[in-house]
């Protein structure tokens, strides 16, 4: 990067990496090695003191291996394939300062993605334009509003396991939002009200309101609470995909998943409470509690043996017959033990309760699909001679229904900064076990396990 003149700066970059195979539980290679190369640029130009123009773009290409089993229970049906992905994007953004309390931003974006693998082939083009305007209304209100439009065009191909009712779609998304931050008591009591509005081609008009309040009685304490609604609108795969993934062990027939052209929006209402306190100059603590209520979640409904279409198969349809609740809390703390030694710790607890509709036949969604307890501890030291020594510990509870046991991970880093331009470091990751699983196999894709590793890094800044 560098400076073209007093008003124009630029940056270019290039990256390339390669990763070798993961391993299966028996220690054999998983044929999921991958590599990626990418490059890009960014230019920032200030033609006037009130204007900033940004142009940036990226291109990339990658190849990622995967191991499949046509029948997950039969090793003889195992085969390997690679995901070939490439694409690029371009972004242009203009920011105009209208006055000391008002700013206008207009941004446009284009993205092209090509993905090609054994089971899925897609080319996707996305064009997006949006406008944001921030201004003050009196001394109490700070208002931000905006409008947006997105056009997505894709082409998909039928494969041996995935077929589509539509081999290409042009989908439009119109959006807008408004938010008002109200200083009820300046610097003490803030109320933020807002909503996002969208219109999509699948489910029509969607509203996502939110409200947040924060109270700062002293410079060392803040209480806050929030309530919001969010949605996930259908994807093409929810509505018009047919996916053959397995063989039913009882009937001996293929399992075929069908999209549902009546699949509707999934929604969640989120309730949050929080407290932040700094009891001493060296200690900071945060507590956040949450309760989420989900409705119309995607379910996979077993319709039994079907001959439409032939040959005979077990028909499974996508529907909206699940509800759920998640609740829990997260406690985080930071302790500056010495000017050169810092500790950070986090504990999170989450509980998931599934509530299927009375007519649902989905038995695959389980309450053990999330880790109930997660603990993280991190130490960072700035040592004499420009050395740095960092250690991290992470515990993740078991995913019972996915047959993933709990695991404990330790990472260590030793770094040296002889001057501001150079950094040399060596890092060890997952040092306690030679390997461990962190996720389950997904349909026919076979999981590999995370291995311990050591790598070195050299960074030069100029």
What is each residue range found by the language model?
Residues 8, 101-109, 113-116, 216, ...:
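Membrane-embedded beta-barrel scaffold of Gram-negative outer-membrane proteins
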Residues 1-3, 13, 44-46, 225, ...:
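Conserved C-terminal beta-signal and adjacent last beta-strands/turns
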Residues 5-24, 36, 70-72, 101-117, 168-203, 215, 220-270, ...:
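Surface-exposed extracellular loop regions of Gram-negative outer-membrane beta-barrel proteins
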């Amino acid at each position: 990067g560098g400076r073209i003149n007093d008003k124009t700066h630029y940056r270019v970059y290039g990256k390339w990496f390669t990763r070798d195979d993961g391993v299966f539980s028996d220690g054999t290679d998983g044929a999921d090695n991958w590599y990626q190369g990418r490059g890009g640029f960014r230019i920032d130009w200030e033609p006037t003191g009130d204007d900033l123009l940004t142009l940036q773009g990226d291109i990339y290409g990658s190849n990622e291996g995967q191991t499949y089993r046509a029948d997950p229970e039969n090793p003889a049906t195992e085969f390997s394939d690679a995901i070939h992905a490439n694409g690029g994007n371009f972004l242009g953004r203009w920011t105009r300062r209208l006055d000391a309390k008002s700013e206008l931003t207009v941004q446009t974006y284009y993205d092209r993605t090509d993905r090609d693998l054994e089971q899925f082939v897609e080319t996707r083009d996305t064009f997006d334009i949006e406008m944001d305007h921030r201004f003050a209304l009196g001394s109490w209100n700070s208002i931000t509003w905006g409008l947006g439009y997105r056009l997505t065009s894709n082409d998909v191909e039928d494969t041996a396991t995935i077929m589509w009712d539509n081999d290409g779609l042009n989908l439009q998304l119109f959006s807008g939002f408004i938010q008002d931050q109200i200083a009820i008591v300046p610097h003490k009591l803030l109320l933020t009200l807002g909503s996002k509005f969208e219109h999509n081609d699948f489910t029509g008009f969607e509203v996502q309101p939110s409200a947040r309040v924060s109270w700062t009685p002293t410079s060392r304490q803040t209480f806050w609470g929030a309530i919001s609604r969010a949605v996930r609108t259908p994807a093409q795969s929810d509505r018009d995909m047919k996916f053959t993934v397995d063989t039913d062990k009882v009937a001996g027939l293929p399992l075929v998943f069908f999209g549902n052209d009546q699949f509707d929006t999934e929604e969640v209402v989120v309730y949050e409470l929080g407290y932040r306190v700094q009891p001493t100059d060296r200690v900071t603590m945060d507590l956040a509690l949450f309760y989420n209520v989900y409705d119309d979640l995607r379910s996979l409904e077993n319709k039994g043996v079907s001959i439409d279409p032939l040959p005979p198969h077990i028909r499974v349809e996508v529907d909206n017959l699940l509800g759920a609740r998640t609740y829990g809390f997260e406690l985080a703390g930071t302790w500056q033990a010495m000017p050169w030694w810092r500790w950070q710790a986090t504990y999170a607890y989450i509980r998931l309760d599934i509530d299927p509709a009375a007519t649902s036949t989905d038995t695959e969604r389980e309450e053990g699909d999330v880790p109930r307890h997660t603990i993280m501890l991190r130490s960072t030291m700035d040592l004499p001679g420009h050395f740095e020594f960092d250690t991290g510990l992470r515990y993740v509870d078991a995913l019972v229904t996915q047959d993933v046991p709990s695991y404990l991970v330790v990472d260590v880093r030793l770094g040296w900064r002889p001057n501001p331009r150079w950094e040399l470091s060596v890092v060890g990751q997952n040092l306690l076990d030679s390997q461990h699983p962190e996720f389950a196999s997904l349909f026919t894709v076979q999981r590999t396990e995370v291995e311990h590793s050591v790598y070195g890094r050299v960074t030069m800044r100029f």
